[in-house]
Amino acid sequence: FLYYFGLSFAGLSAIIDIDENKEIIFGDELTIDHIVWMGTQPTLKEKSERVGIRETLPSAGIISYLHKAVQKGQTVHYLPPYRPEHKLKLMDWLGVPPARQEGSVPFIRAVVAQRNYKSAEEIAEIEKACDVTADMHIKAMEVIRPGMYEYEVVAEMNRVAEMNNCELSFPTIATINGQTLHNHYHGNKIKSGDLFLIDAGAELPSGYCGDMSS
């Protein structure tokens, strides 16, 4: 969603309507309850206009929009869903049972072809993410000492990410028990002679990520 529409907020859906030559973002504006906790925020329409999308509709509007498209005989393309709630939404929106939601092969191929190409701006973002990721690993090498706990090393790595306005690409693996795949426990004490495995990465606000092992 972020790649095609430039927004990263929960509860949004979008349609690229090729026949009508327009893009629509579906979502609900913040209520007073949200504003009390979060303060005044740009409206969904304002956020959408910043990324070049002029038309917004409430979340519920996507159902009638898709139903009309199906009635007109338009082909509705979608990517294979992997989250169960999205499978249920597609069943509600298009009447396609979860077992038959295989996605559109032409759409899949089009997305793959597009994502294989990287613009100069994208490459710069990827390089930034990799630079911050490398700095995280270097910091771990600089601070690690026998007697430290794994979580102390992880804290230093997280600090590097935060200092560069980055989130983590995924939960950090930093462990003396590298023989266990995807070990996210950080409570072991590091001893002299231990082999310390790190798999970690930084994610930029743009969504581009680094992923390195050391």
Predicted feature residues:
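Active-site pocket-lining segments that scaffold enzyme catalytic pockets across diverse folds
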Residues: 118-142, 148-165, 170
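Short, charged/polar low-complexity linear motifs in solvent-exposed/disordered segments
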Residues: 41-44, 143, 200-201
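Short catalytic-site patches enriched in acidic/histidine residues
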Residues: 1, 105-110, 148-214
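A composition/biophysics-driven feature that prefers long, compositionally simple stretches
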Residues: 1-135
